[in-house]
């Protein structure tokens, strides 16, 4: 009969790794997505860890050489565990917001 009381040794259990273990990795992921979708006018600036959802919150700003961080355009959320985007605007939404911010500058 099998002994059901035995627990596996902790040494044999793999330690899961986080896809985005720190703020810098979240910034790089959002930056790469922004460059691919929009270009280099948008900058992933402020980054916060949201404990309740175990996610990174990254603020995206319109930024130029003459006027850095002109306008906040979006908030992006990424799962720290998987690296998946949990919430982000579409390319069209970002383009519209960027056009509006450019006109106001």
Language model features with spans:
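Long, terminal "pre-/pro-" and other extracytoplasmic accessory regions
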Residues: 1-105
């Amino acid at each position: 009969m099998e002994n059901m009381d035995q627990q596996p040794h902790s040494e044999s259990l793999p330690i899961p790794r986080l896809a985005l273990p720190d703020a810098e990795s979240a910034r790089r992921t959002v930056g790469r997505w922004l460059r691919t979708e929009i270009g280099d006018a948008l900058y992933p600036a402020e980054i916060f860890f949201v404990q309740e959802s175990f996610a990174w919150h990254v603020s995206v700003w319109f930024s130029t050489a003459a006027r850095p961080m002109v306008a906040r355009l979006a908030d992006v959320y990424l799962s720290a565990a998987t690296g998946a985007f949990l919430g982000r605007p579409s390319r069209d939404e970002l383009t519209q917001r960027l056009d509006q911010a450019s006109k106001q500058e």
